[in-house]
């Protein structure tokens, strides 16, 4: 079973709803347009990761500071909100008879 599938595609032509994680390293100029597209197309729980450039006017869900020579920051966003919570029930093994 493949757990990771990397694709190099145009963010503008590709439907983003097919992906759990979308990673971009763009200039600040197109970020607002990408944010609008991600909000329209991505599913709840999906992650948009922007390398080095935050989306103006949008608070990231998290920021990761990479310990490299550039002091890279990864800005993490959930455009469609968090994943829905699953209903769970408590389970415990039966005691030995």
What are these regions (language model features)?
Residues 1-18:
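S-adenosyl-L-methionine
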């Amino acid at each position: 079973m493949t757990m990771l599938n990397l694709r190099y595609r145009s963010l503008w032509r590709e439907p983003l709803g097919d992906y759990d994680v979308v990673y971009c390293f763009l200039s600040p100029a197109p970020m607002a347009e990408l944010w609008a597209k991600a909000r329209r197309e991505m599913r709840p729980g999906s992650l948009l990761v922007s390398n080095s450039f935050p989306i103006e006017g949008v608070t990231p869900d998290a920021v990761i500071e990479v310990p490299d020579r550039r002091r890279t920051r990864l800005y993490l966003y959930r455009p469609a909100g968090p994943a829905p919570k699953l209903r769970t029930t408590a389970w415990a093994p039966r005691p030995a008879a």
